[in-house]
Amino acid sequence: MKKVLNIFTIALIIIFAIISCQEGSDSSSSASYSNKVIKVGFAGDSDYQIWNPIVSNLAKEGITVELVTFADYTIPNQALNDGEIDLNAFQHYAYFNDEVSNKGYKLTAIANTYISAMNIYSKKIKSVSEVKKGDKVAIPNDPTNGGRALKVLEAAGLIKVKPEAGDTPSVSDIIENPLNLDIITVDAGGIYSLLPDVACAVINGNYAIDFGLNPGSDYIFKDDPAIYSGNSFVNLIAARTKDKDNELYKKVVAAYQSETVEEIYANNFKGSYLPTWK
């Protein structure tokens, strides 16, 4: 009997030792994360609704994420390239590829997030059929969002652009402008403020939400992803190329590509954001 008790005691010691090692491993894993703050940049304020729950969930794993918001689209890629932030999540592939190609940034897309509607909005008219000759129309001034806006205007029947210009035509690619519209190009984040002064404007989904517009109902013309080719306007998470396989960043991606975020898309963004990782 004594021998049996000794064997039982030894077995318990081994079991507790294994459990202790596992707990120590988990603790050391969390500790290894605690010294690293992952800075994630994005443009506008609407994406806080997405990222705040992600930050909370990652904190439970001992991973600290700091959110950094930028006033416009021209800064987050430079900030990422310069090491001021670790990841950014604000742009689609067309914009990202243009920035990398033209500015030489050493950045890589590490995950897909969503595609966002880019609708036409107005404070003066209820339909694009009410646009008159010589009216002013505002679009973003960067090449990719401006190009996308022109495709939306084309889909609305207001202009026609050269087919060979693809998904990102420029104003010079307009081949038909029957109403002789005055197309004004301004920073994407500043377009909403021009709505009282123009007939209509093409506004990015995140900025529309930031300024209280409902992308599911407030438009006078609704964007249709079918008019674009490939993944040009799918949004992404980017990292510096040298860090594209970083294990911590993979955990951030996993936390983003989750049912929690899908529910936020559906409930908070009124159908404007559609997940693209499935």
Regions found by a protein language model. Name each.
Residues M1-V37:
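Short, low-complexity disordered leader/linker segments with a strong preference
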Residues G24-K39, L58-K60, V128-D135:
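Immediate post-signal peptide segment of exported/extracytoplasmic ligand-binding proteins
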Residues V37, G41-V68, I75, A79:
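Short, polar/charged alpha-helical segment
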Residues L67-Q78, G166-S193:
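Short helix-initiation/N-cap motifs at beta->coil->alpha
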Residues D98-I110, K124-I125, D197, V202, ...:
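Ligand-binding "clamshell"
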Residues I110-I159, E262:
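A conserved helix-loop-strand patch within extracytoplasmic ligand-binding domains
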Residues A117-V128, S232-N246:
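A bilobed periplasmic-binding-protein/Venus flytrap-type ligand-binding module shared by bacterial periplasmic
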Residues N145-E154, Y256-T276:
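Periplasmic-binding protein-like
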